[in-house]
Amino acid sequence: MEQTYQYAWIIPFLPLPVPMLIGLGLLLFPTATKSLRRMWAFQSVLLLSIVMIFSMNLSIQQINSSSVYQYVWSWIINNDFSLEFGYLIDPLTSIMSILITTVGIMVLIYSDNYMSHDHGYLRFFAYMSFFSTSMLGLVTSSNLIQIYIFWELVGMCSYLLIGFWFTRPVAAKACQKAFVTNRVGDFGLLLGILGFYWITGSFEFRDLFQIFNNLISNNEVNFLFVTLCAVLLFAGAIAKSAQFPLHVWLPDAMEGPTPISALIHAATMVAAGIFLVARLMPLFIVIPHIMNFISLIGIITVFLGATLALAQKDIKRGLAYSTMSQLGYMMLALGMGSYRSALFHLITHAYSKALLFLGSGSVIHSMETLVGYCPKKSQNMVLMGGLTKHVPITKNSFLLGTLSLCGIPPLACFWSKDEILNDSWLYSPIFAIIAWSTAGLTAFYMCRIYLLTFEGHLNVHFQNYSGKRNTPLYSISLWGKEGSKISNKNFRLVTLLKMKKNGRPSFFSNKVYKMDENVRNLIQPFLSIPNFGNTKTSLYPYESDNTMLFPILILILFTLFVGFLGIPFNQDVDILSKWLTPSINLLHKNSNNSIDWYEFCKDAVFSVSIASFGIFIAFFLYKPVYSSFQNLDLINSFVKIGPKRIFSDKIKKAIYDWSYNRGYIDAFDGTFLTVGMRKLAEFTHFFDRRIIDGIPNGVGLMSFFVAEVIKSVGGGRISSYLFFYFSYVSIFLLIYYFLNY
């Protein structure tokens, strides 16, 4: 076992040859490298598979022995300062390594087909392999200096992949936004690292935690300064994991290719922030104020992410806000001290979210056959619907991922989210109410995404579709969608969402209608599809190739069974608790993972009931338009005009505006922060040029003019210069004399 640990340093470096060889190949043999470009996908998958096998071997050894291994090389600069580089293998490292490699392999296999048409195929795989190297280096780091180095490399790879299609202005802007937002957090992280080094004199985790605990127990530190340094460290995690208020980059990051969205949201970029807080938990747990602050940021992000996901029309942005909310749950759990629950949810969410993103990529891929390559159209749920019969495998996989994220048993996220929800009652009833309510919102918006994408009819085939924003069909609102006009005058249909001219939503039309015939028999799709600039379009979408479906099917298995790793029914079968034994013993010395069956069933029934209610509301608001009901008296009974109806419409409109406009946070940033920074820059530029530079320039200019005047008066004679010189000296002496008299 010791010998296995000794070679663990190679984990981050195994995927590194791929980007290096691609770069050398493009530099020395560009034609041959491009002609054999599909070969690099196999090499990337092979090397990452070796890392996965090695990581699993380490994990099995840790489960059996509950050990932590650390190896350090010291680089002594002088007697007072030395840099230490090494690697740390503990349960957190092994969990993250398996997560990164398994999801990474699935994404690489998927990308081989998804990116096959792209001219940047080689560049994409070079970035992806370097991304894996950076993230693996981050999770195996043994000190804060290494953490920061790989932290920046992870960010750099994310920026490169977000702006992968850099010729598109929207993608370039999204890349810049991600970079600038994360600069704020990264600068805070750097200051926090330097602050704790100033306090403890060490960057190594084992020394840092021990020295800091001794200082705290002896009351030898300034708690205000310590809290400030901890907040600065946490700022890095806030930006990386898209927590409020530095979350604004995450939805715009969807401008990158869909496979990288899956990797970023499941196991790399956003998971890095959760990993950092989990790694530094021994540091944070002895500072009560910072733990409260972490949980506060987490619960705000939980609710904010869920509300912002309610009205998104872009399928990837809806999933992005879902990720933001679920990361909030993890951060809430860490702030509450529920280390096991947070990591459990990190695992289950990673596979479920990877499944959803790869499923959305399959949908987008199939929609491009209809609308051509245009992300605004191919990712727009307004133009989707009715995909069930065209992409059945993608539909079923997406449904499983949706139900998992909703918290429906026995799927993965049910087990982990339920633990966090139950722990929240013990921490704060207010936080618990918000967390449980958000569970219902999660079920609603995820079911909404599923229904808009797969149920009903294919909206791109509807009559009068032009792709313009002001058309009624384009403007699908928060709560439902609008059907095409039917030429049959006897046709009656309840319009669940009647869009007004200004695009504002209302739930129901102002009239009560009666359905005389079967909707599915009456609505006929119109196949007149406009030309979107891609000549290779077809009338209907089709299922993706097997290369793209294989990773989706594997992720279905993870979504079905990975949750059973952490079911605490029996200590002997609770693999996750055995896995995390060293960390749990460090953080929670008196922890007891035994579970009360009655309490578990009671809480599970309550959580499933809330999720089911959210799903029911989503079906109620969306499904009836496409159902085969002969009589809609139940729905018509809700359609009544009155003061209550008007008031409810105003509430719905406010919710829609809040959600669709991203909580006005981007508008606030653009109006106040961006404009304020520009005005501050203009003021500093004016102050620097006119005041700072103006004073010495003015003195020099004045001296020049005085010299010119004296030169003209003196006439070039030395006697005149001497006369004026002594005259001025006499005048200054007289002035000095009278002032001091």
UniProtKB/Swiss-Prot annotation:
It is an enzyme of class 7 (translocase). One of its GO terms (cellular component) is chloroplast thylakoid membrane. The chain crosses the membrane at residues 9-29, 40-60, 89-109, 125-145, 147-167, 185-205, 219-239, 258-278, 283-303, 327-347, 354-374, 396-416, 425-445, 549-569, 605-625, 718-738. It is a multi-pass membrane protein. Belongs to the complex I subunit 5 family. NDH shuttles electrons from NAD(P)H:plastoquinone, via FMN and iron-sulfur (Fe-S) centers, to quinones in the photosynthetic chain and possibly in a chloroplast respiratory chain. The immediate electron acceptor for the enzyme in this species is believed to be plastoquinone. Couples the redox reaction to proton translocation, and thus conserves the redox energy in a proton gradient. This is NAD(P)H-quinone oxidoreductase subunit 5, chloroplastic.
